[in-house]
């Protein structure tokens, strides 16, 4: 194992442990292989403004893994999930690695980014991942999703309106946010209810992070 790989492995496992996440050996190798490919492809495909690989572990991998404890204990049956505006596969690829029993559709309109995702899916043998190169308003899935997750949407209104046609009855939106978006709840009041707010503890990150669980209001 190279010194760089050893450092990244230690950083990943220590950070994950601080958040109560314990990837197995195969999952650890897959997560590290993913971030190495992310760094390599980032040079040409501009997957992220972050260039340093240790920062990628902190700001991409650990941030994505911070929602694992909530999903693992969720009372909702999240067997079918979609990551909308996934970009380079965040949080979808790390979650697909951690939850091989669930299926994840990764949706993005950027062809360069979805080419990277097809490559990673094949390289890592992620049979539970489907990649879709489409805009959300043009995507007509064969089946609806129990969980719609994203860390990319500008607002909760954009997310819940844009993804309304993807959510199965009884399903939930999982919105990953920085500061608690108080103002974003106003435009969706009466249509969408805030089920739960989770203050995420993201290792190696000082700023606030929140996971908002949302559901359409009963008519």
UniProtKB/Swiss-Prot annotation:
<feature type="binding site">
    <location>
        <position position="85"/>
    </location>
    <ligand>
        <name>S-adenosyl-L-methionine</name>
    </ligand>
</feature>
<feature type="binding site">
    <location>
        <position position="90"/>
    </location>
    <ligand>
        <name>S-adenosyl-L-methionine</name>
    </ligand>
</feature>
<feature type="binding site">
    <location>
        <position position="151"/>
    </location>
    <ligand>
        <name>S-adenosyl-L-methionine</name>
    </ligand>
</feature>
<dbReference type="GO" id="GO:0070043">
    <property type="term" value="F:rRNA (guanine-N7-)-methyltransferase activity"/>
</dbReference>
<keyword id="KW-0489">Methyltransferase</keyword>
<comment type="similarity">
    <text>Belongs to the methyltransferase superfamily. RNA methyltransferase RsmG family.</text>
</comment>
<keyword id="KW-0698">rRNA processing</keyword>
<feature type="binding site">
    <location>
        <begin position="136"/>
        <end position="137"/>
    </location>
    <ligand>
        <name>S-adenosyl-L-methionine</name>
    </ligand>
</feature>
<protein>
    <recommendedName>
        <fullName>Ribosomal RNA small subunit methyltransferase G</fullName>
        <ecNumber>2.1.1.170</ecNumber>
    </recommendedName>
</protein>
<keyword id="KW-0949">S-adenosyl-L-methionine</keyword>
<comment type="function">
    <text>Specifically methylates the N7 position of guanine in position 527 of 16S rRNA.</text>
</comment>
<dbReference type="Pfam" id="PF02527">
    <property type="entry name" value="GidB"/>
</dbReference>
<dbReference type="InterPro" id="IPR003682">
    <property type="entry name" value="rRNA_ssu_MeTfrase_G"/>
</dbReference>
<dbReference type="InterPro" id="IPR029063">
    <property type="entry name" value="SAM-dependent_MTases_sf"/>
</dbReference>
<keyword id="KW-0963">Cytoplasm</keyword>
<dbReference type="GO" id="GO:0005829">
    <property type="term" value="C:cytosol"/>
</dbReference>
<keyword id="KW-0808">Transferase</keyword>
